[in-house]
């Protein structure tokens, strides 16, 4: 029996567990839930697609025949920054959900007229939500943070070399 259905006045689409499952099942936000190999593959594909997107613009700024190193460094930096923005969006989505899961209260709107109300979770629902937050969502947030850290380390070298050459 679902505890939310019997005890919760919050509309289903605003319930933290429903928000968690909808993120987990969405095309974009499910990336961190994939295996490490599949997740890295998606991030690498995003990085390569970003390289393809920025290449025409950067070719007009840095002609590859005259400034090949500047072109390659700027392409890597720009595409990495765009991939970083994708990772930040992933992080923000999951951090919103974990905040709602870990909170003892849930803010919700019934009619959409900005008449928001606060519902205090009963202890069994709070325990279940915190369990999901701690053991399901926090590892995903750590995976995204580690990827962002690795990406920022990868950018630092080309940034220094860009200004050197």
Swiss-Prot record:
PANTHER family: PROTEIN CONSERVED IN THE GREEN LINEAGE AND DIATOMS 27, CHLOROPLASTIC, PTHR34214. This is Uncharacterized protein ycf36. Keywords: Chloroplast, Plastid. It comes from Pyropia yezoensis. Belongs to the ycf36 family. The keyword Chloroplast applies. It comes from the Eukaryota. GO terms for cellular component: chloroplast. InterPro entries: CGLD27-like. The lineage of its organism: Eukaryota, Rhodophyta, Bangiophyceae, Bangiales, Bangiaceae. It is found in: Plastid, Chloroplast.
């Amino acid at each position: 029996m679902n505890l939310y259905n019997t005890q919760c006045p919050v509309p289903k689409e605003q319930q933290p567990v429903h928000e968690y499952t909808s993120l987990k099942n969405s095309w974009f936000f499910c990336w961190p839930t994939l295996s490490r190999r599949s997740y890295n593959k998606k991030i690498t594909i995003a990085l390569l697609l970003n390289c393809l997107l920025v290449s025409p613009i950067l070719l007009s700024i840095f002609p590859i025949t005259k400034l090949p190193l500047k072109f390659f460094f700027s392409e890597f930096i720009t595409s990495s920054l765009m991939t970083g923005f994708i990772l930040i969006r992933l992080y923000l989505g999951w951090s919103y959900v974990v905040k709602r899961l870990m909170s003892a209260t849930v803010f919700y709107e019934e009619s959409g007229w900005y008449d928001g109300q606060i519902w205090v979770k009963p202890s069994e629902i709070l325990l279940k939500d915190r369990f999901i937050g701690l053991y399901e969502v926090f590892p995903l947030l750590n995976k995204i943070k580690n990827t962002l850290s690795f990406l920022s380390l990868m950018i630092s070298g080309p940034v220094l070399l860009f200004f050197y050459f």
